[in-house]
Amino acid sequence: MKYRRILLKLSGEALMGERPYGIDPEVLKSIAGEVASVVRAGVQVAIVVGGGNIWRGRKEAAAQGMDQASADYVGMLATVINALTLQDAIERAGIPTRVQTAIAMQEVAEPYIRRRAIRHLEKGRVVIFGAGSGNPFFTTDTTAALRAAEIDAEVIFKATKVDGVYDADPKTHPQARRYDVLSYQDVLNRDLRVMDSTAIALCKENQLPIVVFDLTTPGNIYRVVQGEPIGTWIGQRTVENNGIPSPGELIPS
């Protein structure tokens, strides 16, 4: 395998499948099976999961006139629901899994402790981080960048419903072009909304590459961790980053 330790960022929407909300059991089973295959191949896997399949903080706050911080705390609890559900699925696939949360809830999960998380990874356990960063006004993408830096992950794999980063929304713009390679600055300058700017800045500061790939294609988690050129790679232009050559200009597919 190409990588020793990775962080997989799963959006809550990725767990919905074709449902309008909630969790699709078949999608959950598929993700768990692929994560288990990666772990059995010797890769240490940490996961940050969102909660958008249950609660959309900013959208709900705007619609109901709800305080933004309160809406964000509700969203953090939604991520814990997803984390516990994902833990159960991965353990049914045969891989021991721990959930660590940024908000204490000792009856159902461990508190987030960096050294303990790393120790779990070294023992071959999957670690799922729930409750975001524990702070309102920060996204789970920022949490992914933060936790990846803390546990010394080599890369963030951001699993989405599209096969990479485009110069426009491919759902509404059929002529949109997909980028194979981008720099952090490209993402910020072009406002490509791969992740929020705080998350991108954290990755840039820590030279932490990001790979955006399509979760809906079976086997893609295993393939992307193997190092197959799937999706869009984001990193420093001047660094080779695990054997991926630095780009000159952006290369649209």
Swiss-Prot record:
GO molecular function: ATP binding; UMP kinase activity
Places the protein is found: Cytoplasm
Keywords of this entry: ATP-binding, Cytoplasm, Kinase, Nucleotide-binding, Pyrimidine biosynthesis, Transferase
UniProt GO cellular component terms: cytoplasm
InterPro entries the record matches: AceGlu_kinase-like_sf, Asp/Glu/Uridylate_kinase, Uridylate_kinase, Uridylate_kinase_bac
Swiss-Prot/TrEMBL catalytic activity: UMP + ATP = UDP + ADP
Protein activity control: Inhibited by UTP.
Residues engaged in binding ATP: 9-12, 52, 56, 160, 166, 169
GO biological process terms held by the UniProt record: 'de novo' CTP biosynthetic process; UDP biosynthetic process
Pathway: Pyrimidine metabolism; CTP biosynthesis via de novo pathway; UDP from UMP (UMPK route): step 1/1
Signal peptide: none
A UniProt-annotated Pfam family: AA_kinase
Residues the record lists as binding UMP: 51, 72, 133-140
EC numbers on record: 2.7.4.22
Top-rank taxon: Bacteria
Name of the top EC class for this enzyme: transferase
Main location: cytoplasm
Role played: Catalyzes the reversible phosphorylation of UMP to UDP.
Self-association state and partner proteins as the record states: Homohexamer.
Family that this chain belongs to: Belongs to the UMP kinase family.
Record protein name field: Uridylate kinase
Organism: Synechococcus sp. (strain JA-2-3B'a(2-13))
